[in-house]
Amino acid sequence: MAVTIDPKTFYANPLPGKPFYVRFEVPSDVAEKALEILSIARQTGKIKKGTNETTKAVERGLAKLVLIAEDVDPPEVVAHLPLLCEEKKVPYVYVPSKEKLGKAAGINVAAAAAVVIEAGQAAGELEALVNKINEIRAKHGLNAIPVRR
């Protein structure tokens, strides 16, 4: 059963200098690792790219990791994803650039969001990354989201 979260409280205290939907600061090495895992999963597993496909994968319970770009304009395009991931208990991470996200997803255009559905050869790395994300989330007062198998 999904947990209902009040959007007014969820988005009440945005990080300074970040879009309102960014709930925690992601170090560049963690963001790069997430992009690397997405790229490996694209080649050996299964991914979806774009906000609509990402939303559907989360709602259907297929998502293992959601990647959300921080430089999306307008931000409302992806603003629902962190809240949806929290409700469905899906790990998510922010990456600094939609261009890098698109490239890691194997497309020649920017992508606002992408999702790992099957990690393929990156399964072990994905688990380690989710644990690292949970450490970061704890520093920002957010609960851990377990690795999805």
Curated annotation (Swiss-Prot):
Q: What is this protein called?
A: Large ribosomal subunit protein eL8
Q: Which GO terms describe its cellular component?
A: cytoplasm; ribonucleoprotein complex; ribosome
- Assembly behavior: Part of the 50S ribosomal subunit. Probably part of the RNase P complex.
Which organism is this entry from? Pyrobaculum calidifontis (strain DSM 21063 / JCM 11548 / VA1)
Q: Does the keyword Membrane apply?
A: no
Which keywords does this chain's UniProt record carry?
Cytoplasm, Ribonucleoprotein, Ribosomal protein, RNA-binding, rRNA-binding, tRNA processing
Source taxon at top rank? Archaea
Describe the function of this protein: Multifunctional RNA-binding protein that recognizes the K-turn motif in ribosomal RNA, the RNA component of RNase P, box H/ACA, box C/D and box C'/D' sRNAs.
Which PANTHER family does the annotation name?
RIBOSOMAL PROTEIN L7AE FAMILY MEMBER
Q: Does the keyword Ribosomal protein apply?
A: yes
- Please name the GO terms that the record assigns under molecular function: ribonuclease P activity; rRNA binding; structural constituent of ribosome
